Amino acid sequence: AATLVTSWALNALTPSIPSGSGMQGLLANARSPLAPHEYVYGQVRKGGANTYLEATGDENKFLHMIITLAGHELDGIDSIYINDEIVTLDGNGFVTTGGWAENGLKVRIKKHLGAANQTVDTDLLAESNLITSDFKGQGIAYLYVRLEYDQDVFANGIPLFTAMVRGKKVGDPRTAQVNYSNNAALCIRDY
């Protein structure tokens, strides 16, 4: 009887882990310079691994982050979310909508699809103390995010950055073409 009561007490005091859908893990940014390469098929909203962080400027005014989305070229990065708010970017990557744009140009996000001929991000190269022209990220899809410190804008810390992406291009034996597809059979065949 004592074992039964002890077992019941432990179960009652142990927090339960929500089972939820598998998608919940995709909407996070883990900090890891050695994260495994992820394959992305079809269209999905996802976060990524923060594989690079650097602070620059007087009193570390700017925070530079690389958020790796996939270990291959993506067909496209359609939209960007800060926390759960979809944002619009201008031609230079600065956020121009929502609360993230109210106090000036505090957030810049640049999209990199991971093409085989991808070159280093010119803004990151110019503003970083550590990045060289060898940092191309060829074959790696990522977001380069620069935050300008503002206590009012970032009162709750670094926000969550996610993107709606179109995944890996896959071969179709029926047409002998390699294109983006959300056809499950073609994606499984590619994997």
Give a label for each model feature.
Residues 1-191:
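Polar, S/T/G-rich
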